[in-house]
Amino acid sequence: MSTVNELVNRVDETYDVSQIEKEIGLDNIALSDLELLATGGYSPLTGFLGKKDYDSVVETLRLNNGSVWSIPITLPVTEEVAETLKVGEEVKLVNGGNVYGVIQIEDIFVPDKEKEALLVYKTTDEAHPGVKKLYERPSVYVGGAIVLTKRFENNPFPSYHLDPIETREEFKKRGWKTVVGFQTRNPVHRAHEYIQKSALEIVDGLFLNPLVGETKSDDIPADVRMESYEVLLQNYYPKDRVFLSVFPAAMRYAGPREAIFHALVRKNFGCTHFIVGRDHAGVGDYYGTYEAQEIFTNFTVEELGITPLFFEHSFYCTKCEAMASTKTCPHGKEDHVILSGTKVRELLRNGEVPPSTFSRREVVEVLIKGLKKEVVTE
């Protein structure tokens, strides 16, 4: 069983920034990364990566000291801004006119973004949303330890926005020794429910941790998804066995590498196990169906500090009249109703109501209502 690792804590709201003149503007990705670095969500990282750690993560999926880390957490700035900065300086980190933190600059370097795209996303295709975002962001990286000096005020989900130290406390309060984490950016459909409940048979608690940071424009909005999770948990899950809290990070769509990243982060939130399903964190056809599971064979459970639980693609079988997978169902593909978040989105956008084999009625009602609201605001 994994041992609970120590959490980084770089939050200090009493930190005096009044004498610091220089500033770096943060985009939404860097802002959410700043919070997760400070609250320990990205432990053992204490700041944005310097060149040595960046190169090591891109090339080997490890930090320079050998610890497993698969996604480069970087602070991009323009060449103009970079020219005004010096190693050793302390600089304010700002967004929307607010100072949210400071960085002690340890490194300023120009990355090879094509190499980063190829190794992290396995493609340089700009149609890939992660690659597109990588190329759109400024071209110089600033590395160094950070301090979060101001918490976010206009948090859309305050009651569900818990730091890792708080989720750990919640699990402890419930007496959960084993907790399985589930990452999602989609409404939970019946295949997800089947997988989650299968995992719940072997652990004490389920940590449903939907990502609510920046996602693709055609992903269902976070507020609609949160309402869909609430109605699902109220009606179909044992209340004392499930805990819902948001993951405020941006989606990278980095497939296999992001699966490792998501597992490491959930370890920090207090999970002992992590669900990895079909095409985890994938997009389009960039990654193989089970590539995000296969990547875990490169690491031991001990060095990850969390146990991955792999699930095959599940479906509704019309002959079994139940959710199943190829491990539990003998029938052919003609009897299988394949479920996916993409399929649910497609049906809804075409004005069709997903059948009960796809999604719970209460969830569908929330999604239809949310979609109508979206159409009106457009």
Swiss-Prot record:
Catalytic class of the enzyme: transferase
The keyword Thylakoid is annotated on this UniProt entry: no
Any one of the GO BP annotations: hydrogen sulfide biosynthetic process
Pathway assignment: Sulfur metabolism; hydrogen sulfide biosynthesis; sulfite from sulfate: step 1/3
Enzyme Commission number, as recorded: 2.7.7.4
The organism's place on the tree of life at top rank: Bacteria
Reaction equation(s) it catalyzes: sulfate + ATP + H(+) = adenosine 5'-phosphosulfate + diphosphate
InterPro entries: ATP-Sase_PUA-like_dom (IPR025980), PUA-like_sf (IPR015947), Rossmann-like_a/b/a_fold (IPR014729), SO4_adenylyltransferase_pro (IPR020792), Sulfurylase_cat_dom (IPR024951), Sulphate_adenylyltransferase (IPR002650)
Keywords assigned: ATP-binding, Nucleotide-binding, Nucleotidyltransferase, Transferase
UniProt-recorded name of the protein: Sulfate adenylyltransferase
Keyword Nucleotidyltransferase in annotation: yes
Family statement: Belongs to the sulfate adenylyltransferase family.
